[in-house]
């Protein structure tokens, strides 16, 4: 990721794109501690006897690594990996996946290296983080020729030697789409198009309907805002019903 690095106290290099002091912390800001507790509670629901000491350690390492970094919303950056980890826990993934979710941006966006991750959490977690980093570096440019999107989807799947890498990347994209309102209109359209062309179809292929449907929903919100808003206002139906309508609209306009 070609960004200018800046030096902060403690010899921590961070990407300038992730520091936005002009943005106030949102009023509905949820503290990292609250999110961490939610993560632990979610894991306990499907793995009540699991030793979570490594997850706690990964959270502390990620929080320290991302210290001084902020999201476009003004929130501390650690909010993002925490939310990614929560999504993975909601899907009942294993401990290594959740640890990798907490650490998925440290190699790309902090001074931590893959070797650091391996030394602290083992080769398995390091390989997951490295896989997510490589997928993030895939260059996507929308083209109307469907075969190009299909080729990129195949490359995406082929590059991920472990299916958990894709799960982490899907969770990463889902949280980014959930917070897309803080991006510029151009970025909203770009990322929504990419999400609908690449990520939603991959989620569908993997049978993760929960993520696939929400990615479609959020993408449509920015790609077809008038249609989406009319749908929300005029169609007084439950969420599954709205999802069915969105699916039909996407099919009619030729989106994946």
Regions found by a protein language model. Give the residues of each.
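Active-site helical microenvironments for divalent-metal-assisted chemistry
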Residues: 1-256
